[in-house]
Amino acid sequence: MKLFSRDNEQTIVRKLNRGDATAIDLLYAEYAPLLTAVCARYVAQNEDIKDILQEAFIKMFDKGRTFNYRGKGSLKAWATRIVINESLLFLRQQAKQEQCFLDKEPPDVVRRRARNWLT
């Protein structure tokens, strides 16, 4: 990954603050490999990672108008935090769906699954 200069980061931030869509292209070009790796620490499936990153970049664009640049690295940290939050949200939603599925199973099936899982 190439290193972004502070001027380049500030340019992206200015574009984000203005709502300029080219800021997302620049952000993606610079940080997609890093953000993909961060997301992969939480989620294993490639399709899920792509979906999470898409949601994260949409959120970055939506929230970019209020992002406050605090110096070198703050843009990267902000983008990383959004990806982590989106990954955790995805995992919570998955767990909730799994719980709903398990709640609909008859009690004997739930007991059998629990017994198999524990052994």
Outline where the language-model segments fall:
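Conserved catalytic/ATP-binding subdomain
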Residues: 7, 47, 73-77, 105
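Arg/Lys-rich amphipathic alpha helix in sigma70-family domain 2
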Residues: 66, 70, 81-101
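Sigma70-family region 2
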Residues: 17-18, 57-72, 93-95
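A short, charge-rich alpha-helical start-of-domain segment used by transcription regulators
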Residues: 13-37
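Extreme N-terminal regulatory/targeting segments of RNA polymerase sigma factors
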Residues: 1-14
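Structural recognition of an alpha-helix C-terminal capping motif at a helix-to-coil junction
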Residues: 37, 51-58, 62, 73-85
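Internal acidic/polar
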Residues: 89, 97-119
